[in-house]
Design a protein with these regions (language model features):
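Hydrophobic faces of well-ordered beta-strands that scaffold small-molecule active sites
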Residues: 6-14, 39-41, 57-63, 90-92, ...
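Conserved anion-binding
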Residues: 79, 89-154
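Catalytic cores of alpha/beta
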Residues: 50, 70-81, 136-148, 170, ...
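Generic N-terminal amphipathic, Lys/Arg-enriched alpha-helix
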Residues: 1-18, 25-31
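Glycine-rich, proline-tolerant flexible connector loops at the mouths of alpha/beta enzymes
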Residues: 28, 32-48, 65-67, 90-109, ...
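Surface-exposed amphipathic alpha-helices with a cationic face
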Residues: 50-54, 108, 112-122, 173-180, ...
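Glycine-rich phosphate-binding active-site loops on the catalytic face of alpha/beta enzymes
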Residues: 61-66, 84-99, 150-168, 187-219
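Active-site cofactor/substrate anionic-group-binding motifs, chiefly glycine-
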Residues: 38-90
Length: 219
């Protein structure tokens, strides 16, 4: 696969606190120009990005990002608002504390509620749950991935890009092994080069979130 063929695998993201409308317009134009999968923006900019991307362009956003420890009611409300206002894909940060404490039922119920509410707005809305693998053991990664699969979500996402580390190939291998390849995998965090992207895709990733999408395909 040559660098330009990677474009459909890439989500071009801007989740900075100082992002402006001009920044969002810029990345929307790049998504359209290079054929990336979607533009990913903070919730506030979802309607603006949807307007810029047009009816066929895909817009994603993040929920409870990056800490994941919002009240469930807030996560649900934010997810619904994002979906109603034009988000096609939602990357939701899980409450890692629940995972570390072994509160599997509570974590699973959170997933189920969010998936149900988003899919009620539109069955084609894509829900991803973020593991934040840098905080988790191999067993925690695998067990949480199985719960994400069972919840009806569309993707396991490995990292936010704002945790203790970015994605590594081992993360993808663990998710794929645990779920027997039955759920798609999105990776993020430190994927800046064509070589890094290809290593992750070869391991089983089907989507990459990055702010360096243009650099990856033009390298």
């Amino acid at each position: 696969m040559n660098p330009k063929d990677l474009a459909p695998f890439l989500d071009l993201a801007n989740h900075h606190a100082n992002t402006t409308a001009a920044d969002i317009e810029d990345i929307c134009e790049k998504v359209k120009k290079y054929g990336f999968n979607a533009v990913f923006v903070n919730q506030y900019f979802v309607p603006f990005a949807k307007q810029k991307m047009g009816p066929t362009g895909k817009v994603g956003t993040v929920i409870a990002f990056p800490l994941g420890q919002d009240f469930l009611e807030i996560k649900i409300a934010a997810s619904k608002a994002a979906a109603i206002n034009g988000a096609d894909e939602l990357d939701v940060s899980l409450n890692v504390g629940l995972i570390k404490e072994g509160k599997w039922n509570e974590s699973f119920e959170e997933m189920l509620n969010i998936v149900r509410e988003v899919k009620a707005i539109g069955q084609k809305k894509i829900v991803k749950f973020i593991l934040e693998t840098g905080y988790l053991t191999d067993d925690e990664i695998k067990k949480t991935s199985v719960l994400i699969l069972k919840s009806g979500a569309d993707f396991v996402k490995t990292n936010s890009g704002m945790g203790p580390r970015g994605v590594i190939v081992r993360d993808v291998e663990l998710v794929k092994e645990a779920t027997e390849g039955k759920i798609k995998i999105k990776v993020a965090g430190g994927v800046d080069t064509y070589e890094e992207a290809m290593a992750l895709i070869n391991a089983g990733a089907s989507r990459i979130g990055t702010s360096k999408a243009v650099e990856i395909i033009t390298s």
